[in-house]
């Protein structure tokens, strides 16, 4: 699974995001300047590949060296791409929110690595992976597919209410899964949170796919 995630999924979704989010933003926001620094993209892709190698070698204590810079790069791109301005249009906002999950996941991976280096304990469980898989991958699939479909169909570039609600469902599922792994206060109801998050994700994805 590490090979598929770090050598395939993350590089592809990151590259598509780097190319398309500024482009789509330029079609909606006035006086928008596209920022797509390719040197930064290649730098991030390099860090991602090394992260994957360290994961395969189970060298978790050193992941923070890669993941925290990745988080900073992602937050920087979100800022330069106009994160706050994107909320003027929901169809654009979902793209920016989805990309933010990549930065959040890298923060969680980095912090977990630092704590593991000091204590030898995995304190966040699978929370970083949930932020990456549910928050980033799933949300970006919905956001990008919705934008591309509307554009190619010649329909108004507006996100309908149902798709917006389903997108919020993905956000809720990601947050619940992260809380279940991170919060000690939620330990007693962890199985219930897993079930609720899973059902929300399945329901939202099924409705969107239909």
Predicted regions, residues:
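Hydrophobic, membrane-inserted alpha-helices
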Residues: 46-52, 73-76, 173-177
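Core segments of alpha-helical transmembrane spans in multipass integral membrane proteins
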Residues: 10, 19, 100-103, 130-148, ...
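Specific transmembrane alpha-helix
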Residues: 70-79, 96-106, 136
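Juxtamembrane membrane-water interface segments of multi-pass membrane proteins
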Residues: 1, 15-37, 53-65, 77-96, ...
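Hydrophobic core segments of alpha-helical transmembrane domains in multi-pass membrane proteins
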Residues: 3-5, 64-73, 197-200
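Alpha-helical transmembrane segments and their membrane-interface exit regions
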Residues: 9-14, 69-79, 139, 202-207
